């Protein structure tokens, strides 16, 4: 990975930490698409994939702040703690504006078994998992 990509990733993580420090809410659309959930990210870690240096996993502890509109799940409520595993990866889509840049991925992250163990271990050590 080039130094420039490394620097740009750490810049993204600094921006993420700034949002946490300012308690900026994250919006996630309800699975039924008739509402949205607002979360505060309390803490996060990142973990580089061992066999893909252009991919970092993000493990977040989120607290639901509100539900706007309709929620497809009736038992969800303000104050619920949830964990999200997502990732950033360098785009390799030819001719895309994002080619060679970090892009956010949240759908079905694939992670090597040994990296999953390392990610969970780090999340426990840094008190992300409560």
Regions found by a protein language model. Name each.
Residues 30-33, 67, 98, 103:
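Intrinsically disordered, low-complexity segments enriched in small/polar residues
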């Amino acid at each position: 990975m080039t130094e420039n990509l490394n620097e740009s990733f750490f810049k993204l993580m600094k921006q993420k930490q700034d949002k946490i420090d300012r308690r900026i809410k994250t919006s996630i659309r309800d699975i039924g698409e008739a509402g949205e959930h607002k979360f505060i990210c309390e803490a996060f870690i990142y973990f580089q994939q061992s066999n893909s240096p252009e991919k970092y996993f993000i493990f977040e502890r989120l607290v639901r702040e509100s539900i706007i509109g309709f929620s497809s799940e009736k038992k969800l409520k303000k104050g619920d703690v949830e964990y999200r595993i997502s990732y950033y990866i360098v785009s390799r889509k030819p001719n895309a504006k994002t080619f060679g840049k970090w892009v956010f991925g949240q759908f079905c992250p694939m992670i090597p078994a040994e990296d999953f163990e390392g990610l969970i271990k780090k999340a426990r050590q840094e008190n992300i998992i409560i």
